[in-house]
Amino acid sequence: MPQFAAQIGSRDGFSDELLHYVDSDGVEYFTVKATGQSGMSPSGLAKLLGVEQAQISRWVNRVQQADPLNNSLPKCLKSFAGHDPNFSAYFDIEKRNILSDSFCVAIIKYYASYSNRANKESQAKAQQTLYSITQIGMRVFIHEKTRWMEA
């Protein structure tokens, strides 16, 4: 039943199952209320990196069509080969997909480290974003290990 519920829009046009945030640059973030599963819209990820949304869409298609065992994907994207990086049951009322947080990180890593085609500004944005994610990720990792919770 969560798939059906996730497809019903609320008054703001997004599923009642999702938390939705848009930052000042128009980057969209989503979290599934019940599970904490997080992700971004393809257009939001593109804005975050300073690239065209078509570039993100090409990577989505490329990983979906890639053979899981034999492909030429960059190392950071290989684990997604043959899989759909979108949330399978959650999308907004316009039926736009939401990319999983792990795929978003892989794309950010690609633009920060592997892409020869990214312009210097996009690469710098990706590197700064990756650094921020790493810092936050390490903090959350340690919090989980020490069982720290905000009071």
Predicted segments, located by residue:
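Positively charged, aromatic-accented nucleic-acid-binding surfaces
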Residues: 1-55, 61-151
